[in-house]
Amino acid sequence: MSFNTFGHIFRVTTWGESHGPALGATVDGCPPGIAIDAEAIQHWLDRRKPGQNRFTTQRQEPDAVRILSGTFEGRSTGTPIQLMIENTDQRSKDYGEIAQSFRPGHADITYHWKYGLRDYRGGGRSSARETAARVAAGGIARAALSELVPDLRIEGYMVQIGPHAIDRSRIDRAEIERNPFWCPDPDTAALWSDYLDGLRKAHDSVGAIVEIRASGVPAGLGAPIYGKLDSDLAAAMMTINAVKGVEIGEGMAAACLTGSENADEIRMGARGPEFLSNHAGGILGGISTGQDVVVRFAVKPTSSILTPRRSITTDGREVEVVTKGRHDPCVGIRAVPVGEAMMACVLLDHLLLDRGQTGGLRGPIGEA
């Protein structure tokens, strides 16, 4: 197995390299009859594409998606959907000086160890450019979810860049689309702007924390032990380039709480059981509770920087490496739409799994 595919029923295979002629995704398992609109998929891709502001790489890629198969008269046929995005702004010459050197923090050395050769142009398959294909596939998942679970909403935003976190008391979700950071706190967005400008001038980069929230998720998605919804979400987020940690709900902070603080109490409401808090992040025992599913992931600083770094060459010589080219000072910014796409793919996959196993049946609560 080459491990380029994820999912159980809704399966996504991505292909292509950063400086190849194209990249894309093959989406298998999409239910038939779903309205598939290339313009809607393009909307999600436009949110991720590079070169939109000074805080992301200046590589100018239109990321125009083409649907090559799997649809007829605007609807899915149930057969594999092939999505292709052409690369149009490669500058492979920027990488000529490091063809024989391993860039610190990159997958250069591990790819070389494993395969005996590597595409040094922008990292090849290990480049974050690959995530464009995931966002396109996520557009298919969103289209299916919008028909199968109309009230489900997925929203991603940045909660921290470097040491600077948002003030959650000031969260205004209307602000998320109004700044280049997907930041729900306008005061923090202004702080991040100045902070990143300073890092860019210093030829450095920084990490970030992204939060993805899904509301309207039906209760009952996921399965015990080895089919947990949260384990699949964590695995999906960990596959995103530069992600080094994932947490669900309170996550690591739950270690600082007592049992009486952390356990979400339950009461009967007008429409059934209601949780009084959501420390669990919408998942208990691997199964969704019907509350918001909340996932956060930490993104490491961009490893490609203009500051000289010590490394070695393929023949063992010690050198200093300066990575030229066009790179994000904070790759976490463009990871927001990628995290949303992965959330959509996993939720649709588990919705289809649940319908196949239980038919959507639910145990009654509060009925005489």
Curated annotation (Swiss-Prot):
Under the heading SUPFAM superfamilies, the entry gives:
Chorismate synthase, AroC (SSF103263)
Q: Give the top-level enzyme category.
A: lyase
Q: Which reaction does it catalyse?
A: 5-O-(1-carboxyvinyl)-3-phosphoshikimate = chorismate + phosphate
Cited PROSITE patterns:
CHORISMATE_SYNTHASE_1 (PS00787), CHORISMATE_SYNTHASE_3 (PS00789)
CDD domains on file: Chorismate_synthase
Cofactor(s) required for function per UniProt: FMNH2
> Is Manganese found in the keyword set?
no
Mention any Pfam family matching this sequence. Chorismate_synt
Q: How is the cofactor bound?
A: Reduced FMN (FMNH(2)).
Which pathway is it part of? Metabolic intermediate biosynthesis; chorismate biosynthesis; chorismate from D-erythrose 4-phosphate and phosphoenolpyruvate: step 7/7
One GO molecular-function entry: FMN binding
Q: Which residues bind NADP(+)?
A: R48, R54
Matching InterPro entries: Chorismate_synth (IPR000453), Chorismate_synth_AroC_sf (IPR035904), Chorismate_synthase_CS (IPR020541)
Which EC number(s) does the record attach to this protein?
4.2.3.5
Mention one GO biological process in which this protein takes part, according to its record.
chorismate biosynthetic process
Which cellular component appears as one GO term in the record?
cytosol
Alphabetically ordered keywords of this record: Amino-acid biosynthesis, Aromatic amino acid biosynthesis, FAD, Flavoprotein, FMN, Lyase, NADP
Q: Where does FMN bind?
A: R125, S126, S127, N241, A242, G285, K300, P301, T302, S303, S304, R326
Assembly and oligomerization: Homotetramer.
HAMAP family cross-referenced by the UniProt entry: Chorismate_synth (MF_00300)
Biological role: This reaction introduces a second double bond into the aromatic ring system.
The similarity annotation says: Belongs to the chorismate synthase family.
Name it: Chorismate synthase
Native source organism of the sequence: Cereibacter sphaeroides (strain ATCC 17025 / ATH 2.4.3) (Rhodobacter sphaeroides)
What gene is behind this protein? aroC
